[in-house]
Amino acid sequence: RFGESFWGFLPRTVLGSLRSAWHLEKTRLNRQGRSPWTLRNDVLNAWAMSVVLFAALGLAFGPGILAYLFLQAVFGFCLLEVVNYIEHYGLLRQRTASGRYERCAPRHSWNSDNVTSNVLLYHLQRHSDHHANPTRRYQALRHFEGIPEMPTGYAGMIVLAYFPPLWRRIMDRRVLAHYGDDIALVNIHPAKRSAVLTRHGAAA
């Protein structure tokens, strides 16, 4: 969301993902006539496996390793979510005349064709093609002209995202340029919407 820092996005997406995962599993199990409180629940199953893994490593290497396991887990999901943040910042699928959102297309996510990062990250930065064609193998992901383009590879973008003033200075103008300076087309953070529209001379 335009105007939302990564540090504001992080708790929202982590908690939202937990709620969404639980709701989806509860709905799936209810259709089968089952309670969500079962190991057939993939959410509980994953949590249980994590507890078993941490306990086994704690027994093998001593309780001191638990702090390292906790830190790597936090680092892991923070890395996942900062990538999520940089891949979609400010972009919005518009509603069609039918009231439905338009089909997902390469223009709905940020792309990078940085050679070094693409080699190291298995073309992760060609996210636009994956976004529009999720079944395409990573080796065949393509770069498109005229789609939102990151100014650098993922390593540089992740560092920028950790410093919101730098991020906004570089990325806000790129979001606006992608939409032809039409702020009404941008995915704006609701808490900042009025201030953003006023700053850009648009009606709230």
Task: Label every PLM stretch briefly.
Residues W37-F61:
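A conserved active-site cap/scaffold subdomain adjacent to cofactor or substrate pockets
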